[in-house]
């Protein structure tokens, strides 16, 4: 999928969720069947030969392509969620945000030392949530970890949140 096609199908909403913020709404990419298929096909081609055994999707828009990609890759799908959303025993990572802290959790038995894991979310801004998820999956003993986003907000330097030896892929940088 061309970057121009992605950008043309991405909705921009000014002053959301607060004044002064330009929100990039990826739901317009998901409601367009051609875009949805192209994104899935592109992600599949990027990771089909990496030996991925688990895809971790970050709540909540990371669930959409993460689940579809896991099925296409023949991998398991793991949900990374905010506290109180997962029913079994969890492991968690707390991380700093601009105003306070937040926590991300996965089931304790979701990842093990034999897993090659792809972490997926829709958009890379500051990288805080994904960096916490990366640390969490590392603690679970994953053999190898890849990170992917559909969109990257380049001006926010979110890649700095990750160790230099981690591959971070995006389909479109704005």
Curated annotation (Swiss-Prot):
Reactions listed under catalytic activity: AMP + diphosphate = 5-phospho-alpha-D-ribose 1-diphosphate + adenine
Keywords, in A-Z order: Cytoplasm, Glycosyltransferase, Purine salvage, Transferase
Pathway recorded for this protein: Purine metabolism; AMP biosynthesis via salvage pathway; AMP from adenine: step 1/1
Keyword field contains Cytoplasm: yes
Recorded GO MF terms: adenine phosphoribosyltransferase activity
Localization: Cytoplasm
Assigned EC number: 2.4.2.7
Top-level lineage group: Bacteria
One Pfam family in the UniProt entry: Pribosyltran
Enzyme class name: transferase
Signal sequence, start to end: none
GO BP terms: adenine salvage; AMP salvage; purine ribonucleoside salvage
CDD domains per UniProt: PRTases_typeI (cd06223)
Major localisation: cytoplasm
One GO cellular component, as annotated: cytoplasm
Family under the similarity heading: Belongs to the purine/pyrimidine phosphoribosyltransferase family.
Assembly and interaction partners: Homodimer.
Function noted in UniProt: Catalyzes a salvage reaction resulting in the formation of AMP, that is energically less costly than de novo synthesis.
Protein name stated in the entry: Adenine phosphoribosyltransferase
